[in-house]
Amino acid sequence: MSDVRTDGGEDGPSGAPGAAAEVGESDFVEYGIEDKPPLGESILLGFQHYLTMIGATVAIPLALAGAMGMFETAPGDVGRLVGTFFVVSGIATLAQTTIGNRYPIVQGGTFSMLAPALAIIGALAAQGAGYQVMLQELQGAIIAAAIVEVIVGYLGLMGALKRFLSPVVIAPVIALIGLALFNVPQITNPTFAETSQQNWWLLGLTVGSIVLFSQYLDDYHRVFRLFPVLIGIVVAWLVAVILSVSGFYTPQSVGYVDLAAVASAPLIQPVVPLQWGMPQFTFAFFAGMFAGVLASMIESFGDYHAVARLSGVSAPSKKRINHGIGMEGLGNLFAGIMGTGNGSTSYSENIGAIGITGVASRYVVQIGAVVMLIVGYFGPFGQLVATLPTPIVGGLFIAMFGQIAAVGLSNLKYVDLDSSRNVFIVGLSLFAGLAIPAYMGATGGAGAFQQGMASVAIIGPILGIKIISDTIFVVGSTGMAVGGLIAFLLDNTVSGTTEERGIDAWEDIAEDEDAFESFFERMGS
């Protein structure tokens, strides 16, 4: 394990103030948190940070757009939805790195809120609602859940819960974010079976390219190590373009690429607040979305520890965690107002990039945020992303969701896996987080579930109330909510030492509470 570099000035690599004596998981820190590389280099490094998470930034709006039927009913708005994600990501990242926890961590759309969003969309689709109504309901649910997150963060509640959120809880929650999305339509869409020669192989090409560049060619050139997802998407997309132009793919094929939409896209797209209409507030949808927000808070809790470890500094204090969660709540609030249909949270992909490149500079991430903000308003870019065929998006999902599941399970390195207690809790949480949502999906929808609840003996009249049954349905359909609740309950009631649960391992590397100064404290000093 290498020592953190502490030599160098503004343009040289150094460790951040208060850095730990050792770098937790990285072999080096090329640029510390407080370092400012030259502007030209910072722009390239900042854009690189965003390229590492562009797959997720693109995957989420495309998943939402597909579920809402936007590709068929409003293909022109798909590009605007993608652009909105980039704008929100840029603003949220600037806010977090400047006045939040001040870690070099990118903020953007979160998979933890995708599952409840898809459940909400499914419930509304059964009622015949259009995509704008769906987005308005998603906006309301996100805004309401975000307000609660802001309160939890800035009142210090998240820091106070630190001793209750061990890796035993965090691991299954993050893992289920990826595992619970294995059957999204872009992967399991039955139309693939009807055109297997034109679609399954394109999906396989996408996955195979990502595997090739990330696992086999990563040692041959840095570009393969840094951008395997992006290169894999580009390779598969170029193949689809060639087949579309040559006529092998017809406009009716799911592999067809329509470049005409890119040429007709406005140069500057109108990404504005409340662009889909006024938010609608439904309690059941809020409850389901808050389960996703809660999962994102737990995920960010683990991400803060990871980014500190890879940046060569001490683990976050309760104070830093509180300010980070509070700012993520404000980011979610902004995302709800802008109408992404999703929220904003810390990106594990960005943290992994720090470990690979050793670039942990806050300044670099801020430069990249400005680049992403500008790109979000550039219409042709968003529309170009929207041309990705469904099989390519499905291949991207397989790679991304699998990576997220693995990141979650990696938190178990801190716990005693020889303990039958820990193995039981993690196993039960993971299984329930997959089984219960599968059961909910087989009930026939929220309406059929309500009828079933109403027929329950004795308490049926209570469970059959629409707001109650809808809340149970949405929460029960969200894997990370189910698994997280079970893990939290068992981990804090079944006997186990703090060392056994992995809490001591985190406490041993935590920074002092006085080491972090909030934005307002810095302004007053």
Regions found by a protein language model. Name each.
Residues 91-103, 148-162, 211-221, 304-312, ...:
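C-terminal ends of transmembrane helices
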Residues 2-8, 72, 194-199, 209-298, ...:
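Flexible hinge motifs at transmembrane-helix junctions and intramembrane kinks/re-entrant loops
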Residues 68, 97-101, 333-337, 347-438, ...:
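Hydrophobic alpha-helical bundle architecture
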Residues 1-41, 497-525:
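Haloarchaeal acidic low-complexity proteome signature biased toward cell-envelope/secretome components but also
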